[in-house]
Amino acid sequence: MTQFTTSQQAAITHDGHDVLVSASAGSGKTTVLVERIIQKILKQHADITRMLIVTFTRAATAEMRTKIQTALKKALTERRHELSGEDRRHLANQIAMVNAAKISTLDAFSLQIVQTYYYVIDLDPGFRLLTDETERYMLQERVWDDLREQLYASDEAPAFEQLTANFSGDRDDSGLQDLMFELIRQAGATTDPKAYLEGLATPYAPEKWEATFSQQIWPRVKGQLLQIATSLTQASALANQLPNPIWYQQIQADLAPLQTLLETNAPTYDTVRSVLISHEFAAWSRISKGLDDADKDTKNAAKDLRDAAKKTWQNKLAPTFALAAEQIGDLLREAQPLVATLANVALKFEDALTAEKAARHVQDYSDIAHNALRILQQKDPQTGAPIADNYRASFDEVMVDEYQDISPLQEALLAAVSTTTPGDRFMVGDVKQSIYGFRLADPQLFIHKYQTFQDAPTDPAAPERIILAENFRSTKNVLAFTNLIFSQIMDPEVGDLSYDNAAALRYGALDYGDAHPAVKVLLYSKATSDEDSSDASELPGDADDNEPVDIATGQTQLVLAEIQRLINDPDAQLWDRQAQEYRRIHYRDITLLTRQTSQNSLIQTQFAAAGVPLFVADTKNFFKTTELMVMLALLKVIDNQKQDIPLVAVLRSPIVGLSADQLALIRLAAKQVPYYDAVTAFLQAEPKTPLAQRTHDMLTHFFNQLSHFRDLARENDLVTLLWAIYQDTGFLDYVGGTPGGSQRQANLQALIDRARTYEAGGFKGLFAFIHFITLMQKQDQDLAMPAQVDPDNDAVKLMTIHKSKGLEFPVVFLMQANKHFNMRDQTGTAILTKQGIGIKWLDPETRVEYELPQYQAAKAARQNQTLAEEMRLLYVALTRAQQRLYVVGATMSGNQLTSADKTVEKWAAAAEGEARVLAPQVRSGATSYLDWIGPALIRHPQARGLAETTIKPALVGDETEFTIEIDVNPQVTPTATPEKVSDDSGTMVDLSAWFKKAYPFQAATTTTGFQSVSEIKRAFDDPDTIDLVNADRFLGPKPPMRDLTAPAFLTETPSGISPAAIGTATHLLLQLVDLAKPITMASLRALRDQLTTKQVIAVDVAKHIDLTALIRFFETDLGRLLLAKPQQVHREVPFSMLLPADQVFEALADDPGEDVLIHGIIDGYVSDEQGVTLFDYKTDHNPNTAVLVDRYRGQLNLYAQALQDLQPKPVLHRYLVFLRTGTVVDLVASGAGK
């Protein structure tokens, strides 16, 4: 039975009021939620159909329903005899009712409301759900195009033209379109979209400017002033320690005006501006007389703090107050009508979009949610009571999972169906894992309740906060590392929440073993400390997807090296929590987490080159498959055949099949014209060569097909056109015969399904369909289903942090920690927030663009939101790890790779300050995860080897174990590029003649072009071989069958142990024995027992290894040679080589010129100044040495030839070591090797 903690038990049992459960990562929140439901049913006879249980995904809904039903069945089975008859019937009834319970997503619950009460808002119930983002976008695009034309032709044209000019570029008006779509999306997340849009222009009213400043701008400015004051106060305290008061006086002069402002109650814009523009930071005094080294360090530290304050002053405050109040008034008088026009157009667009959806009988999920809220606010025609009351009366409790991801609209829906006095809501989530801002989730809703609800309130009706801090997922160091970072970077100012003792993770997984591996930070760095050039004007995030390939490759190589170490190192182990023992690490235990998928291709390439299996969970490659690219190119040509790139793609594809030579021949017909015109010219000319004639015929056939397809496209639907293409070209059948054929055919079928869905949405026409597909590609939409992780697939997993939420992995690598945050949405002509809009106003006469204060406020708000969400993403990434955690990045300056010492120096400067939490300007100025992690680590005792920073008092005694490993330009072994095979234009042939012709190389069909020595060994009867293939065809002396004694491990021993297993174990012992130490019976037993303990060799097999035979071997001349030169001994050496086929297969003696690729593994060789000594172990029982030498001569010859190819030294000796008899034969000395 599960043992719950005190806080978990409280979350399970406390009710009669609203309960907010703040459940940290790995704290078992879903288990608690399910247990709460079970306990209510078991102990309170609650009815599950009177509970509303909402989650955020359909998968989570199905999982919860299953868990509840399973738990109830288990309770009925285990407690059947102790339950009364009534209790058993109740429990059985609840099990049956689970499928009917209201366990659903919020979208599904909203849909149910609409489908039940559609008539009270006059909604047509026959609507179709508009779930495809691209289809929704196209619908918006069509409505916007119509509205735009109407506006250009109306009396509002001048105002609309100015609107377009202000928010669009010089080339087109897509900027205004994008802004309009985003406005509608932002408004859709509110409870009243119309009110949101109507209120956009209010903050721009000149007469309300001071109110706008006081409510929206001054709070931000005050926060920045407090940051500056904090830095200056710290600098002042340092300067006061110096013998000369000049620096203290300078800092006090800087502090005085700030303190005056901060003490002023509700200062006006002019008051603040006058102080800011009138104050100048005096030049820092360079006096050094009378200062010892410690004083100089103190002085420099004070200067650094003052410089940081000055930078914030100049870079963040000054732009906000660049204009005088009179100038702002003038600009607002110009800007307010512009914003009013924008709001007016947005309202018209929203109305037109609603009308179009009604005409098409479609509703998206935002429409459904708003309609559900409208319905809940209406009265029931039958009872006259508010419909919301009907729902409140039907639910005893409303339970919400993942509450941190709620939007204001969803919160309003939940509030409408919940009881308020006392509350009946149970909300569980973790605001530190709120990472769906792009879906307009509002974590402030959770934070407000977190800050206002009480821990253990005395009033039984008061809302309660319960914190689940115990983490049952991760080892101590993973949790300590996470706490170490977040206790220094997250607070209400930057991060929205204080990461205090209540928020910190606590170790709860007491079943882990003793080992808690240290967290590792792996950094790819530059070798020298040369000055790096970087574009200071480049905004953070501008080059987010353009990280230099060599930097990304370097980081990937670091990861690959560490993965190979983990896999190969027997001491690198994981604790198996089920078996309660340590085990080796497998590839499937390892997961790579990335912020984005932009480097996935590069990572896949590097892993493939290294031979490390990789499973990519975030696959979006439907439109990148060859068959889809060919089909899309053909559709474009059918729509417009004068498109060069699609036309050439189709001509080169299997649909037409022209070679590169044929394409060049066409181009020669007309060199300086579009390719379609060159094709036309070629077809009009008389073919003069067989190749030209064949090309002419192929083009003629294709253009006849193309004409037919164009007719079909005009007269029929898309599905008919696509089926005709598949049938007439045979393309569907063709791809079925290629590798992965069934999947390729499924992809082509999916294209037809997509076309059918597209036309069902009311869209028509090939051109629009092509545009639809193009939009899907641009918006990163895909038809391919997300790949599912196969637990039996032994491969490293690669996925985004978003995809990993809710999952856990034994080993986690957080990749690209140096990658810039994406701040691009803070640089446009307009920035949207939940409060409204900030715009840049473009003077139509001077074309000068002004950043209005409202824009500055919106920009700051958006930046804070972005940083807070990035911080939460980092938290999610770190807390996915169960036992081993790696943070991987590069030492960067801007977008340039820099040296480690520069990066460490930057971290040390950022870590200044006595407070545990890093300075606000350091955290708000971060552009990557490393900008937070580095300063947080550099001030820790374990980082003393990197920088001589002062260990902060708050970190003294911190037991977090981590290492920072810096690799300077790791050597990347380039992958060999296969030689390109030239295209063969070929000629037309008579296929019937082909079928009648006798194949001249019939013998070769009974062999393979790729042979392992294990297959060829049959010619030599190697007893190490288990799989014997085509033995009668191998070249070499074939002893009479009567002389063939079965080798030792092809027969079974009396003990029942396979001789093959004994032979393999013997070889393994010889491979791993330490030749640098004396070989004794005790050392061999110790090695055997070690391999047995690690389960490399089975215990019953180990007992049958003949250790005496091994001792006897090392007493021979060859054995003593190995012991004398251990550094020059090479064991288990793989090789591959090409041999003429007639040297391997007797049947091919008459077919010279053919080659066979041979691969195998040599037992070992010794290389010294004179040459190479080759040796190979055998375990035959046959005492006839002459027969054995004859049997293995060919095999040793192959090995010797391979060694000669691998290295330049001659092979002087070829030893066969017969372990059973203790005989060592040199084939060269005996003459048997010839």
Curated annotation (Swiss-Prot):
Positions annotated to bind ATP: 23-30
GO biological process, one term: double-strand break repair via homologous recombination
Residue span, UvrD-like helicase ATP-binding domain: 2-475
GO cellular component: cytosol; DNA helicase complex
Keywords: ATP-binding, DNA damage, DNA repair, DNA-binding, Exonuclease, Helicase, Hydrolase, Isomerase, Nuclease, Nucleotide-binding
Molecular function in Gene Ontology: 3'-5' DNA helicase activity; 3'-5' exonuclease activity; ATP binding; ATP hydrolysis activity; double-stranded DNA binding
EC number(s) recorded for this UniProt protein: 3.1.-.-, 5.6.2.4
Keyword Zinc: no
Required cofactor(s): Mg(2+)
Domain UvrD-like helicase C-terminal: 507-806
SUPFAM superfamilies: P-loop containing nucleoside triphosphate hydrolases, Restriction endonuclease-like
Reaction catalysis annotation: Couples ATP hydrolysis with the unwinding of duplex DNA by translocating in the 3'-5' direction; ATP + H2O = ADP + phosphate + H(+)
InterPro entries: AddA (IPR014152), DNA_helicase_UvrD-like_C (IPR014017), DNA_helicase_UvrD/REP (IPR000212), P-loop_NTPase (IPR027417), PDDEXK-like_dom_sf (IPR011604), PDDEXK_AddAB-type (IPR038726), Restrct_endonuc-II-like (IPR011335), UvrD-like_ATP-bd (IPR014016)
Role played: The heterodimer acts as both an ATP-dependent DNA helicase and an ATP-dependent, dual-direction single-stranded exonuclease. Recognizes the chi site generating a DNA molecule suitable for the initiation of homologous recombination. The AddA nuclease domain is required for chi fragment generation; this subunit has the helicase and 3' -> 5' nuclease activities.
Sequence similarity: Belongs to the helicase family. AddA subfamily.
Summary of subunit composition and partner proteins: Heterodimer of AddA and AddB/RexB.
UniProt name for this protein: ATP-dependent helicase/nuclease subunit A
